[in-house]
Amino acid sequence: MPYTPIVATLGYVLSPDGRRVLMIHRNARPDDHQLGKYNGLGGKVEPCEDVLAGMRREIREEAGIECDELQLRGTLSWPGFGKHGEDWLGFIFTITRFSGTPLERNPEGALEWVELDRLHELPMWEGDRHFLPLVFDGDPRPFHGVMPYRDGRMQSWSYSRF
């Protein structure tokens, strides 16, 4: 069976001092399969859109700011991750400079600045705890990981860097 994932972006907006990250607390829609979890910002890449343009658009739509400086931190394949078992392929970015003032909330939930050293305390997808340290570790090499899910649970995790 061919691998035809949903292509998406996931971005982590850093505060100007680099000590905090803008997270969405998915608390607005009772039918949200991510209800109660914290996550970065992002979403599906649209047809005829490259991943960088998709990341910029998602940050604009979800946070109301413009990305001035981005860095690709890695890619992640999430087989079986979707609500109905769909496969996802994510391009993960940090946004280190932006223009504008972030929104306080959007239709998915509240936007909150969180200290980087407190991220591990938040309710989030189990797998995020494995790859988030790689997003913020300062290693200039992007990581490339695979994290299969089944029934909403991470099954395994592996990655490489080059």
Mark where each language-model region is.
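Low-complexity, intrinsically disordered Gly/Pro/Thr-rich segments
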Residues: 141-149
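A generic fold-level signal
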Residues: 4-6, 16, 32-33, 85-87, ...
